[in-house]
C-alpha cells in the first residue's frame, strides 16, 4: 500500500524574497573574498617597487546611513571596503603596510532592494544558456554543434548535407574545420582522417600555419585581422577562438559530461582536442549514434542572479584598479622618497563601477512599489533580456512558449504583456536557485514506507524520467487509491498513471504558479489569459485609506504580507512598554533594556503611493516571538488587503456598463470606500557657482502675495499648509547677468574699475502644478558640496493627496475583469436587493461567458454568503481534487446556510441558484429576470483619471510642422486625426473643423492674428495661404523628385470630352 508521510514530510513555503538575499549573501561571504585574492601582486617595470593586496583579510565597514536614512537623505546605502596592502621598495629595503580604502559597495537591504541616491532599485535575475556544447538539427538537414562560452558568445561546427565539416562564426561567414585546426598549430598527423576526408578542396588547404591563419581570416571576412597577420603585429587566432571563448568552470564540466572527457575543471580555455572530439560526436549524431539536445530545456540554462552580476562588476573594477596601480607606481618612481600607499590605490574604480552598474544596468530596475505584492513579484522576475541574452526582436516564438521542463520552476501564466510576452517571466512559489544557477523545485517523494517520506529538491534534468503526480486529486492513504488512475508527468509528457507507478507528487496544488497567480481564488475556472490579466492588475492596485481583507482568499495572503517587509513581527518574546504613531518601545524577556522599533509614517514610495505602518499592540501587552505587532499600508491583521468587498450585480443598466464600463454607487465616495492616499515629491535646487547664484528667499518681486502666503521666513512652504495649483512651494531667485547694462561703455568701464558684475534676477520658484493640490506633510533640506557643481542645496517638498474614486478611474477584480467608471448614481437610484440593500457596482454580464473567467461568479456568490454569515474563506485553487464540482457544491451549500441563518429564502432559490430578484431604485419595479448578485473583491488601480486627463489652451509647438507637441508632461495637445475629422463631418461642424485644422493647429500666420482679433473684439479672420505642415509635405515630395503645382480651374482651360453614352 502506498502512502505519503504527512507528518515527517511537512513543507514550509520559502521566503519569497530569499532568492535576492541568498544571492547577495553568497557574494559578500564567498565571491568577494575569492576575487580579491586573485588580485595578486603588482610589480613595477624595473622590479624596484612591488604592491601586494591581502584580499583575504578584507573588511566591510558599517554603513554611514541605514536604509531609511539613505532614502531620507537621498543617499546611497553602501559600505566601505578596506583591505591591508604592502608596498615594498626593494632597492631601499622599505616596506609599508597599511589598510587601504578600496571603494564603496552598494548593500542590499533586508527587503532585497538597493537604495541608490534615495531611490529603491531591484536587480532582476537573468536566464541564459549554460556554457557548453549543444547538438541540433536544422530544417535544412544541417547538423550543428554550438559551443557557448561563459560570456555568452558562441560559434558553431556544422556538418552539411554533403558531409563536409565547417566552422561558422557569425551568420554569413564560415571556413573548413581543417583550416582552423591547422591555424591553431595542429600538425596533419595529429588530425583524424575523418576530418581530412570531410573537407572540400583539400589541396588548397594544405598550408603552413601562417598561410592558414591568413586564409582563415579571409574566409571569415576579417580584413583587419588579415592585415595584422601580414604585418606580424598580433596573432588573431588566440583573440578569435581562445580568449573570447573562455568556457569557465561550469562550461568545462558540461563539456566533459557531454563528450565524456576527463579534462581538469580548471582548464577553462577551449582546446583543439575539444574541437576534434566535438566534430567526431557530430558525425556520430548524423549517423544515428548519440542524441540531439533541446536548447530550450531548462537543464541547458542557468540563472545569472545578483551574485554573478556583482562578481562580474567587481572583476572589471579590479582590472581598472590594476591599471591605476601600475600608473601610480610609474609616477612614484620620480618621487620615491614620498612613497605612500594612499597615493597608489585609487578608490574611484570600485565605487564608480558599482554605482554605474546599479544605477544604469539594464537589469537594475526602478522598484515597483505600488503595493506589497508588486514589490514581491518584481523581485521574483526572471528575464531573458539583457547583456548576453535576447532582445524582444530576436526572441522567437519557440523561446517564448511554455516548455515542459519549466513545470514547478517558471510560472506558465504570469508574464509580461506585449512584446515582452514569454521573455519576462516569474519564479513559482516553490522554486529556488541551487548551485551553478540551476532552478530547483521541491517535490514530495512517494514511497512504500510512510516513515521515509520527505521533501527533496530536484534539478531540471533529474525529474525528466521521474513520474510526478500533478496533485489534481486528493491523496488518501488507503488501499482503494493504489490502483486509481491520476494525471501525472513523465518524460516531459502529461500522462495518466496508477498510484503504484507514482514516484513523486507536488508539495502544493499551486506548485506550478507564481505569487501573483496563487492569490486568485477559483483559479481553475478561469481562462489562462484572464488569469494573466488578473495577476498583473493585482500589482497595479492602490492601497486604500480604509482597508479590508477579502472574504474569499487562497490562504497565501499572509505569506505575501510577511515576506514583503511591510508588516513588523516581534524578533523575541517581550513586553510592550510604549506605543505611538512613530515607534514601539518594548522590554525583552529576562532583560531590563528598553528597545525601540521605528515605524513608517506616511512615507512616499517609488510609485507615489503611501507607505505607512500602524501598531496593533497595546501598552503592557506581552507578545511572543514572531507575533505581529504592526500592520502595513496594505495589510489587515497580517493579511494582504488591496481592495474592498463590494456588492456587485451582473446586469445591463441603461447602457452605462457597455464595453466593460462600470456603474458605481455614490456610497463609495461619501464613505471613503475607495479613497486612496498619494504622496507627490517636488524638488527645488539652489546652486552657488562662479557663473550664477541661486537664492532661496521669500521676497519674490512681481508675484502676487496670495501665492506666497504659505512661505515661511526661509522661503520654503510651511508644514501642514494646504496648497493649490499655482502656489509657491519654494521661493527662488536666480542671478543672471543683466544684458541691458553691458551695451554702454560707461557701465563696462565701471565694472572693470570696481571689479563687480551687473546682475539681474529671474523668478525660478517651485510652484504647485496643475492638479497637484494637497497637504504639505514634509520638507527636507539636503546639502551637498561638489567641486564640479559647487555648493548645492536641494529641497524636497512632499504633498499628500486624498483621491476619491471618480468617473474615469479604473477598477478591476482578481479574474481579469476590469473596467472604467462611467457614471456615479445616487444610492436611491441604484438597484437594490429584496432586503433593501442597494448594490455598489453594476458590471456587464457579457464580460463573463466570452472571456471564460467563471471564477469571478464563484467568488462573488461565496462572498455574498460570507457577508451574511460573517465568515472568511481561504480556499486553495484546484479544489476539484476533493471531488467533481467541488466549487459549485461549496458555494451552493454556503448560500443555503446563509438563507437558513438569515431567514432570507431569496439568497438561495432552487429554481435559479445564485440569482435573485432585484428592484429598480428609480421606479421600485422588479427587473424582468433574476440577476447574479454577490460580494466581489474589487481593486482601484493606479491608472487614475487625475493622472491621465489633460487640457491645453496654448503651449509649445513643434519647430518643423508648427503643430502642438505631444504629451501631457510637455503641455502638449492632441492632434485631430482622421477619425476625429469624420466625427466633426458627421455633425456638420464645418467651421469648427476648419479652425482645428488651420488656426488652432499649424497655420502660424492665422494663429498669431487670432488673439489680436479676440482682444479687439473683431471677427477672427479666415486663414490665407497654406499651413506649415503642407509646406513640409511639399518639401519632402520635392526631395523625392515630385513637383506639386496648382492651377485655377475654369471653363476656359477645361478639356471637353465627348459623351460616350451618346454612342
Curated annotation (Swiss-Prot):
It is an enzyme of class 2 (transferase). It comes from the Eukaryota. GO terms for biological process: DNA-templated transcription. Its EC number is 2.7.7.6. Gene3D superfamilies: 2.40.50.100, 2.40.50.150, 3.90.1100.10, DNA-directed RNA polymerase, beta subunit, external 1 domain, DNA-directed RNA polymerase, subunit 2, domain 6, RNA polymerase alpha subunit dimerisation domain, RNA polymerase Rpb2, domain 2. PROSITE patterns: RNA_POL_BETA (PS01166). It holds the Pfam family RNA_pol_Rpb2_1. Keywords: Chloroplast, DNA-directed RNA polymerase, Nucleotidyltransferase, Plastid, Transcription, Transferase. It catalyses: RNA(n) + a ribonucleoside 5'-triphosphate = RNA(n+1) + diphosphate. CDD domains: RNA_pol_B_RPB2. In plastids the minimal PEP RNA polymerase catalytic core is composed of four subunits: alpha, beta, beta', and beta''. When a (nuclear-encoded) sigma factor is associated with the core the holoenzyme is formed, which can initiate transcription. Belongs to the RNA polymerase beta chain family. DNA-dependent RNA polymerase catalyzes the transcription of DNA into RNA using the four ribonucleoside triphosphates as substrates. This is DNA-directed RNA polymerase subunit beta. It comes from Zygnema circumcarinatum (Green alga).
Amino acid at each position: 500500500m502506498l502512502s505519503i508521510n504527512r507528518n515527517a514530510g511537512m513543507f514550509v513555503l520559502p521566503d519569497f524574497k530569499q532568492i535576492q538575499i541568498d544571492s547577495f549573501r553568497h557574494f559578500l561571504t564567498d565571491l568577494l573574498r575569492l576575487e580579491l585574492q586573485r588580485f595578486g601582486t603588482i610589480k613595477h617595470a624595473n622590479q624596484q617597487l612591488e604592491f601586494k593586496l591581502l584580499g583575504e583579510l578584507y573588511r566591510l565597514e558599517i554603513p554611514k546611513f541605514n536604509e531609511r536614512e539613505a532614502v531620507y537623505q537621498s543617499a546611497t546605502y553602501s559600505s566601505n571596503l578596506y583591505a591591508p596592502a604592502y608596498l615594498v621598495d626593494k632597492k631601499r629595503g622599505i616596506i609599508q603596510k597599511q589598510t587601504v580604502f578600496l571603494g564603496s559597495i552598494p548593500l542590499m537591504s533586508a527587503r532585497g532592494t538597493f537604495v541608490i541616491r534615495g531611490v529603491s532599485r531591484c536587480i532582476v535575475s537573468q536566464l541564459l544558456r549554460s556554457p557548453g556544447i549543444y547538438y541540433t538539427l536544422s530544417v535544412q538537414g544541417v547538423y550543428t554543434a554550438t559551443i557557448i562560452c561563459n560570456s555568452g558568445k558562441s560559434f558553431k561546427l556544422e556538418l552539411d548535407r554533403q558531409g563536409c565539416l565547417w566552422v561558422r562564426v557569425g551568420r554569413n561567414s564560415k571556413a573548413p574545420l581543417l583550416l582552423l585546426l591547422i591555424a591553431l598549430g595542429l600538425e596533419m598527423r595529429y588530425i583524424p582522417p575523418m576530418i581530412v576526408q570531410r573537407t572540400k578542396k583539400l589541396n588548397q588547404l594544405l598550408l603552413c600555419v601562417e598561410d592558414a591563419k591568413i586564409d582563415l581570416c579571409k574566409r571569415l571576412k576579417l580584413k583587419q585581422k588579415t592585415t595584422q597577420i601580414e604585418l606580424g603585429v598580433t596573432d588573431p587566432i588566440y583573440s578569435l577562438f581562445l580568449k573570447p571563448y573562455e568556457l569557465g568552470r561550469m562550461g568545462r564540466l558540461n563539456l566533459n559530461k557531454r563528450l565524456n572527457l576527463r579534462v581538469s575543471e580548471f582548464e577553462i580555455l577551449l582546446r583543439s582536442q575539444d574541437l576534434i572530439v566535438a566534430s567526431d560526436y557530430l558525425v556520430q549524431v548524423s549517423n544515428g549514434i548519440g542524441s540531439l539536445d533541446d536548447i530550450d530545456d531548462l537543464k541547458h540554462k542557468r540563472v545569472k542572479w545578483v551574485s554573478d552580476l556583482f562578481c562580474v562588476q567587481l572583476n572589471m573594477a579590479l582590472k581598472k584598479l590594476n591599471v591605476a596601480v601600475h600608473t601610480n607606481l610609474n609616477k612614484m618612481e620620480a618621487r620615491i622618497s614620498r612613497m605612500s600607499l594612499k597615493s597608489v590605490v585609487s578608490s574611484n574604480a570600485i565605487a564608480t563601477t558599482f554605482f554605474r552598474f546599479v544605477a544604469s544596468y539594464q537589469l537594475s530596475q526602478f522598484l515597483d512599489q505600488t503595493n506589497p505584492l508588486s514589490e514581491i513579484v518584481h523581485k521574483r522576475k526572471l528575464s531573458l533580456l539583457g547583456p548576453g541574452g535576447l532582445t524582444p526582436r530576436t526572441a522567437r516564438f519557440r523561446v517564448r512558449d511554455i516548455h515542459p521542463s519549466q513545470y514547478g520552476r517558471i510560472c506558465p501564466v504570469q508574464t509580461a504583456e506585449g512584446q515582452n510576452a514569454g521573455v519576462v517571466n516569474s519564479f513559482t512559489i516553490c522554486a529556488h536557485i541551487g548551485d551553478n544557477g540551476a532552478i530547483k523545485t521541491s517535490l514530495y517523494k512517494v514511497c512504500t514506507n510512510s516513515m521515509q517520506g520527505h521533501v527533496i529538491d530536484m534539478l531540471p534534468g533529474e525529474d525528466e524520467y521521474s513520474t510526478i503526480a500533478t496533485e489534481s486529486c486528493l491523496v488518501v492513504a488507503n488501499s482503494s487509491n493504489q490502483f486509481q488512475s491520476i494525471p501525472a508527468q513523465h518524460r516531459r509528457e502529461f500522462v495518466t498513471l496508477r498510484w503504484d507507478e507514482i514516484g513523486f507528487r507536488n508539495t502544493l496544488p499551486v506548485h506550478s504558479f507564481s505569487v501573483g497567480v496563487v492569490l486568485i481564488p477559483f483559479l481553475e475556472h478561469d481562462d489562462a489569459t484572464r488569469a494573466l490579466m488578473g495577476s498583473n492588475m493585482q500589482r497595479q492596485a492602490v492601497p486604500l485609506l480604509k482597508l479590508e481583507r477579502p472574504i474569499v482568499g487562497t490562504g497565501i495572503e499572509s505569506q505575501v504580507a510577511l515576506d514583503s517587509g511591510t508588516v513588523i513581527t516581534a524578533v523575541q518574546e517581550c513586553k510592550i512598554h510604549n506605543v505611538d504613531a512613530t515607534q514601539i518601545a518594548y522590554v525583552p524577556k529576562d532583560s531590563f533594556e528598553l528597545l525601540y522599533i521605528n515605524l513608517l509614517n506616511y512615507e512616499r514610495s517609488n510609485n507615489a503611493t503611501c507607505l505607512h505602518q500602524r501598531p496593533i499592540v497595546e501598552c503592557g501587552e506581552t507578545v511572543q516571538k514572531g507575533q505581529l505587532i504592526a500592520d502595513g499600508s496594505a495589510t489587515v491583521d497580517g493579511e494582504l488587503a488591496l481592495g474592498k468587498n463590494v456588492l456587485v450585480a451582473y446586469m445591463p443598466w441603461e447602457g452605462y456598463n457597455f464595453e466593460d464600463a462600470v456603474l458605481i454607487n455614490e456610497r463609495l465616495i461619501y464613505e471613503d470606500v475607495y479613497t486612496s492616499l498619494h504622496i507627490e515629491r517636488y524638488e527645488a535646487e539652489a546652486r552657488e557657482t562662479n557663473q550664477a547664484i541661486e537664492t532661496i528667499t521669500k521676497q519674490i518681486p512681481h508675484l502676487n502675495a496670495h501665492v506666497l502666503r504659505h512661505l515661511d521666513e526661509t522661503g520654503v512652504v510651511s508644514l501642514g499648509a494646504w496648497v493649490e495649483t499655482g502656489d509657491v512651494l519654494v521661493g527662488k531667485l536666480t542671478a543672471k547677468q543683466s544684458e541691458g547694462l553691458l551695451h554702454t561703455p560707461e557701465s563696462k568701464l565701471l565694472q572693470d574699475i570696481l571689479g563687480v558684475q551687473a546682475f539681474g534676477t529671474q523668478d525660478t520658484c517651485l510652484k504647485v502644478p496643475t492638479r497637484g493640490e494637497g497637504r504639505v506633510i514634509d520638507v527636507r533640506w539636503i546639502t551637498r558640496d561638489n567641486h564640479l557643481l559647487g555648493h548645492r542645496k536641494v529641497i524636497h517638498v512632499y504633498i499628500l493627496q486624498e483621491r476619491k474614486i471618480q468617473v474615469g478611474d479604473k477598477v478591476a477584480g482578481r479574474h481579469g475583469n476590469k473596467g472604467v467608471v462611467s457614471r456615479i448614481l445616487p444610492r436611491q437610484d441604484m438597484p437594490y436587493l429584496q432586503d433593501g440593500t442597494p448594490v455598489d457596482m453594476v458590471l456587464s454580464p457579457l464580460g463573463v461567458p466570452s472571456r471564460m473567467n467563471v471564477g469571478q461568479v464563484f467568488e462573488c456568490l461565496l462572498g455574498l454568503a460570507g457577508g451574511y454569515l460573517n465568515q472568511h474563506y481561504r480556499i486553495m485553487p484546484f479544489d476539484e481534487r476533493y471531488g467533481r464540482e467541488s466549487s459549485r457544491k461549496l458555494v451552493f451549500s454556503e448560500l443555503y446556510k446563509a438563507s437558513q441563518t438569515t431567514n432570507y429564502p431569496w439568497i438561495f432559490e432552487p429554481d435559479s441558484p445564485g440569482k435573485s430578484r432585484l428592484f429598480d431604485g428609480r421606479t421600485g419595479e422588479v427587473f424582468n429576470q433574476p440577476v447574479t448578485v454577490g460580494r466581489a473583491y474589487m481593486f482601484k488601480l493606479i491608472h487614475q483619471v487625475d493622472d491621465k486627463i489633460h487640457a491645453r489652451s496654448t503651449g509649445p509647438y513643434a519647430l518643423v510642422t508648427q503643430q502642438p507637441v505631444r504629451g501631457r508632461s510637455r503641455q502638449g495637445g492632441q492632434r485631430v486625426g482622421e477619425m476625429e475629422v469624420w466625427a466633426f463631418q458627421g455633425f456638420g461642424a464645418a467651421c469648427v473643423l476648419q479652425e482645428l485644422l488651420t488656426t488652432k493647429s499649424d497655420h502660424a500666420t492665422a494663429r498669431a492674428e487670432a488673439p489680436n482679433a479676440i482682444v479687439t473684439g473683431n471677427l477672427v479672420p479666415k486663414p490665407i495661404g497654406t499651413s506649415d505642415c503642407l509646406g513640409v509635405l511639399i518639401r519632402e515630395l520635392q526631395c523625392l523628385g515630385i513637383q506639386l503645382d496648382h492651377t485655377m480651374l475654369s471653363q476656359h482651360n477645361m478639356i471637353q470630352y465627348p459623351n460616350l453614352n451618346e454612342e
